């Protein structure tokens, strides 16, 4: 059995655990395979979001779009998008209504839902670690810190909002290398959008992320920020979308697609 087959077995096993109710962030799971953010909307909102993603490709790089009413994806053909993520969020009128590990019963109330699978920066973390760059939330066993920024996304139709960014502390002498490595993955957010000086992004306290967990920033390290696929959730809130389902931040959909597929 080759390494890709082993990784796909690990991904399938992880999705089975999530289907059975296990909840945990997915960073470091099934290394070598792409992970995705998810936003699911009624069909009447799908075109607005597709246009929003097209106008904001670094924050919302779309890897797949489902047919209306479908709960499957070509990214992992045996998976079920209603059950196979570890944790979901349900949104009503732009407000977080609940977090659930299974949304089948809610999905069944809507016949025309369209899911967007959006690239996730967890995908390039394997390459960072192979280069000897510490990925702090993995080494500390927690979720990646994510922050609302003051960077305004290009609006589309009824949708508008600001970019959410993820942060990884990187040793100052490795920042350029980290940017080169991640820049080879434009389909999963690509190169950083900002380095250092978080206040220029409107972030006043790195110890209090809006999503995820704070991580240690050691002497000689610089906070480096990437566009984040939680941006659609900020857009749902800002635009007061009547109904949506999303992944919970850090709790991704693990695909069967190798990371290398998105490497350029």
Swiss-Prot record:
Entry keyword Oxidoreductase: no
Record-linked SUPFAM superfamilies: PSTPO5379-like
One annotated GO molecular function: lyase activity
Protein's UniProt keywords contain Metal-binding: no
Documented EC number(s): 4.2.1.-
Top enzyme category: lyase
Keywords: Lyase
Pfam families xref list: D-Glu_cyclase
UniProt cross-references to InterPro entries, sorted A to Z: D-Glu_cyclase (IPR009906), Putative_hydro-lyase (IPR038021), UPF0317 (IPR016938)
Family indicated by similarity: Belongs to the D-glutamate cyclase family.
Alphabetized NCBIfam families for the sequence: PRK05463.1 (NF003969)
HAMAP family attached to this UniProt entry: Hydro_lyase
PANTHER family on file: D-GLUTAMATE CYCLASE, MITOCHONDRIAL
The protein's name in its UniProt record: Putative hydro-lyase Psyr_0498
Organism expressing this protein natively: Pseudomonas syringae pv. syringae (strain B728a)
Taxonomic placement: Bacteria, Pseudomonadati, Pseudomonadota, Gammaproteobacteria, Pseudomonadales
């Amino acid at each position: 059995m080759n390494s890709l087959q082993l990784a796909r077995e690990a991904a399938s096993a992880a999705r089975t655990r999530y289907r059975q109710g296990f909840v945990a962030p997915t960073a470091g799971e099934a290394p070598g395979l792409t992970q995705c953010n998810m936003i699911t909307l009624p069909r009447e909102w799908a075109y607005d979001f597709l246009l929003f993603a097209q106008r904001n490709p670094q924050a919302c790089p779309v890897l797949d779009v489902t047919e209306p009413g479908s709960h499957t994806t070509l990214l992992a053909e045996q998976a079920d998008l209603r059950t196979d993520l570890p944790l979901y969020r349900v949104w009503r009128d732009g407000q977080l209504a609940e977090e659930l590990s299974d949304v089948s019963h809610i999905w069944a109330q809507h016949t025309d839902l369209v899911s967007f699978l959006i690239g996730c920066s967890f995908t390039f973390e394997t390459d960072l670690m192979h280069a000897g760059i510490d990925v702090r939330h993995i080494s500390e066993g927690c979720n990646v810190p994510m922050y609302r920024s003051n960077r305004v996304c290009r609006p589309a139709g009824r949708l508008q909002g600001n970019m959410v960014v993820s942060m990884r502390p990187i040793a100052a002498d490795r920042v350029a290398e980290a940017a080169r490595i991640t820049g080879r993955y434009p389909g999963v957010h690509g190169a950083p959008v900002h380095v250092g000086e978080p206040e220029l992004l409107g972030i006043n306290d790195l110890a209090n992320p809006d999503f995820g967990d704070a991580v240690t920033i050691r002497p000689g390290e610089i906070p480096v920020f990437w566009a984040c696929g939680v941006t659609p959730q900020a857009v749902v809130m800002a635009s007061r979308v009547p109904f949506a389902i999303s992944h919970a931040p850090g709790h991704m959909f693990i695909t069967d697609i190798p990371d290398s597929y998105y490497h350029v």
